Amino acid sequence: MGLIVCSIVPLGYPMKDIVAPLKDRKQLALMVSAGVLITFNWSTYIWAVNNGQILQTSLGYYIEPLFVCALGSLIFKEVFHIHKILAICFAAAGVLILLVYFHELPKVALILPITFATYAALKKKVKASAVISLYYENIFLMPIVIAYIVHRELAGNGALAAVDLKIYILLLFSGFVTFVPLALFAVGAKNLPLVTLGITGYLSPTITFLIGILVLHENLNKVLLIAFLVIWVGLIIFTRGEILEHRGKLSVRGKDED
């Protein structure tokens, strides 16, 4: 994705808009930090998918909206009602069930929401446009990533050694599939409350969960199922509370207009 972003932006944006963030070190640091976080997030996800941990990624992204909500309340002082507290408690209970049973924290299921929620919080503080922000997230990390890829290829254990050329080309350009939703997320992170972003976060883990069970046939044991159910209860409480809160705001707004 970095190659695509870094190629498209200079063609579609005036140079003054591209270099403007360089004048603000704080903003530049925010964007580079966001790039590091999302890279770590993606790397964890890719490792998990390739090591039979798809259900853990689904679990992590179910928890992620609650982390986003918590950061929204702590950092941006967004209202933190009782339904949000209950939802986070249920999510914590789900993680605790896995901890007690497996005698270790579900690392993937915690790394993904923590890194992505922090990424969302940083993006909300970025002043640059969504695409320019993505450009700086990628441009400073590209040399490191390219050096790593070259090292793996020269060592004989890179993608070229494992797949044919057509698949390798698809891998190189698959970043475009990621660029579009991430650009849209960047727009949403700047213009929507983190609570709203959190609710929309349910779609991805649901699709991932279904793929893990129905397509890749990962083992869903009783303990993991119970953990999912506990977290789903928390999400139901959270969603219901958000809907009622939204309706209340609309009702008050309507009365004020009258």
Regions picked out by a protein language model, each given a short descriptive name:
Residues V5, V9, H103-N157, G248-D258:
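Transmembrane alpha-helical segments that form core, pore/gating elements
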